[in-house]
């Protein structure tokens, strides 16, 4: 199984990395093309495009102007350790063993508006460019048109290398939309996580994001290859519900109300 997760808006470039191993992103020529567009934007245009504050607009204008190859441990950080959102709290990559990080390096991928597809230990410079951003570019009017089937083709390489038949989608809709499903050579498993609130099971964003990260870790720790093994996920009180799972490849995990 190959797993994909979303990136995070929050970044941590202050905590020293838990490993000195690193690799380079594989789609940097595409990133460079996007950067040429981004560097032309004024802070005001960035704010309007991304719907962010003046302060954040200025920060990201500076990031765009400072972004430069080559990536080193002095000016970049491993992606899985740099992203700092809810998914990454659940994944908790800094506590993975060296062997688990090696396994993650070949079985986990991070979708990215700027980098396309990242390996966990790929060095990454700070940026903000969400996949849903309507950034006009040489290939179209947004990032979905820019990436086209590039991400799916790269995933196919990973799937083939690991002889994997499943792609586990633990990403958000915004990001997974960037994967050209028709070009993908795999069955897609999309787990759903629902928490009980006021007697009803529903998707609660914060909990669901963290659960995606926890499942990504579970798949790494247990080297899961089959759907039946994935359904055995019972971390943090979640459990597979056959009754709630309407589609075979969309397993639903429930968690009862927290006391």
UniProtKB/Swiss-Prot annotation:
Q: Where are the transmembrane segments?
A: none
Q: Which InterPro entries match?
A: YaaA (IPR005583)
Q: Which organism is it from?
A: Pseudoalteromonas translucida (strain TAC 125)
The entry's protein name is UPF0246 protein PSHAa2558
What GO biological process terms does the UniProt entry carry, in alphabetical order? response to hydroperoxide
A Pfam family found in this protein is: H2O2_YaaD
**GO CC field:** cytosol
What the record says about family reads:
Belongs to the UPF0246 family.
